[in-house]
């Protein structure tokens, strides 16, 4: 179990990982069983780019709207019939939360009858084996992979295999989906699945496709890494005209779409992550009529995507106007304007800008000016103790960068002149080393004068201030007489010791004076 959790954690982007944790915590607090399902599991196992997060709950996800919004998610749309929430999680992460359900089709082309189900029953209603897997995100079973149709084996074999015989009858949009997956992954369609597709074409089941399914397929084109290739494959299979009868590759701005993909890759390398989906739809439908575009927009379930697509040109024109005005009169002001603008607008404007001044400023923003950013005077800043540990460091570094952009700092002298007032005060000098020997004793005596009073008691008092004697300990009434100090021995030639005399009692008697008590 832990292996799939580990694989998930290393395959998700940091923002996607945060999104999984956000949904997981909300579901856990509500006591709802949660699974990561569908395309997300397929892409985690296969190694393809994880485009969005698909969650399935055993319960009603519509009841989680307030909690999800409070946690930071944006509700892009809600489908009451399918009990599905379309979310935009922090970091522009797309996600869906659907209820585990059974779909029973009573008639071709009619919406299914929906009823609650377990996660295994939910997996049985899906389209292809590679999409019929679920990963538990619940305590006690977290990391458990449910794969009742051996989808992991088909991923390893790189095959598109339908789940059951009536898959294309129940939901004709799966015909378009099969072609889209085969084109995206460059995987072949399994033989029996291919035979069922041909049978569905002969019976013209595609005419029963619902508007909801058409809208979902149009939306999915916006998220493809190579949408032009997908559109060409759909046109070859006669599926593109199903999405719109007037749509063809001739209506696509192929050059603009190619430049968009290239520019997005360049922005990704610089650390930017713009969402290209509104611009992708713009170029895919560049030569379609206004009515056709309006009809397509009505069918797309994510209304935030529709709004972004609709406002794309107007917002780009507004940004271009600001780039040619006083707000962008200097390089530093232009940098500030483009840094604060929506990344999607900058991406789209770089591809579509017609004014040379606008195009050049965006080009400088991603090119020449970033080279200036690499020339911050780090040596001078370090000399003045202006380091990243300072709370003010980001602002100081930004201010220096702005001055460098505008050409106001040239020499080392100018740089130091600007930085010195911003430098922190020098640190205090280090404490002196500890004193040793007589100096240490003298210092100790100065610190504790009472300790040196006693030795001075026997000496004459100095003419200075009198020193109070230390209190003496109480003396006992009878004190043994202290022995006299021994006399210093004279340095004479050694003499023979006199023989000792003994008394009658046998005790030795010292010759001469009475022996001193030692």
Residue ranges with predicted function:
Residues 1-518:
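Catalytic cores of the polymerase beta-like nucleotidyltransferase superfamily
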């Amino acid at each position: 179990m832990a292996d799939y959790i580990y694989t998930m954690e290393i395959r998700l982007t940091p923002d996607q990982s945060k999104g999984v944790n956000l949904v997981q915590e909300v579901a856990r607090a509500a006591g709802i069983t949660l699974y990561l399902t569908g395309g997300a599991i397929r892409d985690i196992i296969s190694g393809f780019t994880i485009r969005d997060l698909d969650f399935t709950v055993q319960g009603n996800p519509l009841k989680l709207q307030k909690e999800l919004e409070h946690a930071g998610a944006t509700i892009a749309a809600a489908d009451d019939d399918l009990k599905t929430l379309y979310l935009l999680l922090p970091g522009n992460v797309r996600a869906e939360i659907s209820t585990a359900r059974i779909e029973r089709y009573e008639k071709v082309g009619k919406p299914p009858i929906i009823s609650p189900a377990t996660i295994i029953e939910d997996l049985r209603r899906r389209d292809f084996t590679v999409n019929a897997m679920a990963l538990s995100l619940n305590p006690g079973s977290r990391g458990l992979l449910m794969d009742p149709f051996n989808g992991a084996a088909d991923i390893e074999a790189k095959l598109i295999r339908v789940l059951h015989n009536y898959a294309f009858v129940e939901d004709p949009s799966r015909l378009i989906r099969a072609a889209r997956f085969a084109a995206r992954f460059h995987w072949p369609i399994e033989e029996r699945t291919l035979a069922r597709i041909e049978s569905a074409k002969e019976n013209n089941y595609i005419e029963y496709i619902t508007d909801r399914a058409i809208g979902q397929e149009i939306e999915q084109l916006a998220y493809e890494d190579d949408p032009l290739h997908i559109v060409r494959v759909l046109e070859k299979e006669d599926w593109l005209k199903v999405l719109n009868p007037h749509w063809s590759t001739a209506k696509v701005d192929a050059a603009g779409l190619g430049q968009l993909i290239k520019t997005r890759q360049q922005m990704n390398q610089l650390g930017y992550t713009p969402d290209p989906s509104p611009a992708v739809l713009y170029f895919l439908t560049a030569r379609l009529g206004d009515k056709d575009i309006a009809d397509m927009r009505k069918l797309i379930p994510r209304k935030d995507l529709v709004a972004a697509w609709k406002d794309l040109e107007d917002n780009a024109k507004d940004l271009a106007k600001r780039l040619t005005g006083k707000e962008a009169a200097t390089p530093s002001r232009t940098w500030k304007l483009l840094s604060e603008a929506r990344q999607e607008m900058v991406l789209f404007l770089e591809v579509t800008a017609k004014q040379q001044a606008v195009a050049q400023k965006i080009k400088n923003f991603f090119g020449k000016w970033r080279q200036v950013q690499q020339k911050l005077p780090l040596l001078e800043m370090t000399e003045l103790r202006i380091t990243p540990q300072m709370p003010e460091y980001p602002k100081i570094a930004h201010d220096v960068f702005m001055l460098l952009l505008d050409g106001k700092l040239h020499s080392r002298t100018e740089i130091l002149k600007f930085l010195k007032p911003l430098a922190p005060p020098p640190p205090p000098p280090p404490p002196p080393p500890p004193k040793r020997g007589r100096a240490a004793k003298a210092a100790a005596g100065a610190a504790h004068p009472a300790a040196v009073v006693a030795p001075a008691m026997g000496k004459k008092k100095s003419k200075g201030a009198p020193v109070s004697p230390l209190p003496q300990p109480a003396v006992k009434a009878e004190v043994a007489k202290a022995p006299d100090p021994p006399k210093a021995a004279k340095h004479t030639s050694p003499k023979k010791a006199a023989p000792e005399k003994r008394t009658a009692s046998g005790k030795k008697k010292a010759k001469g004076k009475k022996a001193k008590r030692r």
